[in-house]
UniProtKB/Swiss-Prot annotation:
PANTHER family assigned to the protein according to its UniProt record, in alphabetical order: FMN-DEPENDENT NADH-AZOREDUCTASE 1, FMN-DEPENDENT NADH:QUINONE OXIDOREDUCTASE
Protein name listed in UniProt: FMN-dependent NADH:quinone oxidoreductase 8
Naturally occurring in which organism (per UniProt): Burkholderia lata (strain ATCC 17760 / DSM 23089 / LMG 22485 / NCIMB 9086 / R18194 / 383)
Name of the coding gene: azoR8
Alphabetized Pfam families for the sequence: Flavodoxin_2
UniProtKB keywords: Flavoprotein, FMN, NAD, Oxidoreductase
Length: 210
């Protein structure tokens, strides 16, 4: 059964541009995959702790030597990793804050880049045969001719992390100039509709099995 993992990082709820774009993607994916399964992971609704010293102690302890408290500390991380490993396609919906991803998405990444699970002990990525679509909403635009193009940290960072864990089939859909919606220059629905074709193409692309 084809499985889509939806990771949401915006705190803006129904007003969120990235969530609106992600919803378009999911609806299109469901049309393509009639028997597909969707896993929803809303990071704003997940009690996602930052990495702590006890967590690191549990992480670096071999599983056979972990105490029950250590296993409890890693339980959510294990769950997040299992979601990724069970998915064929992952869509990450995120705003851009200060040119990078929000803290909650960085915290998520710290929980899913795991030696022995998503990353081999020699550094090779273990998450193979999956596609990822990154859906981003930013106040400004980071197009090739943009004067702030070099400030786009978020895209490169997410591509790098995905490649590190083994996902190289990555499509980025950038909702730049989203501030126009907040300023009343364009309606939210019209802004989202401009990306309908990109969403359809991304949702329809086959996953290259490795």
């Amino acid at each position: 059964m084809p499985t889509l993992l939806v990771v949401e990082a915006s705190p803006r709820g129904e007003q969120s541009i990235s969530r609106g774009l992600t919803k378009m993607f999911v609806n299109q994916w469901k049309r393509e995959q009639h028997d597909g399964r969707v896993i929803q992971r809303d990071l704003m609704a997940t009690d996602l702790p930052f990495v702590t010293m006890p967590w690191l102690g549990a992480y670096f302890t071999p599983p056979e030597h972990q105490t029950q408290d250590m296993k409890n500390l890693l339980r959510l991380s294990d769950e997040l990793v299992a979601e990724i490993l069970s998915a064929d396609h992952i869509v990450i919906g995120t705003p851009v804050y200060n040119y990078n991803v929000p803290a909650v998405l960085k915290a998520y990444i710290d929980h899913i880049v795991r030696k022995g699970k998503t990353l081999g002990f020699s550094g090779e990525g273990l998450v193979k045969g999956k596609a990822c679509t990154i859906v981003m909403a930013s106040g400004g635009a980071y197009t090739p001719d943009s004067p702030i193009r070099d400030r786009d940290i978020a895209t490169g960072y997410l591509r790098l992390i995905l490649k590190v864990i083994g996902i190289e089939d990555v499509t980025v859909i950038a909702g730049g100039n989203a501030k126009a919606v907040d300023m009343g220059e364009i309606s939210r629905s019209d802004f989202l509709e401009a990306f309908a074709s990109d969403m359809a193409d991304a949702a329809a692309r086959p996953v290259v099995q490795v």
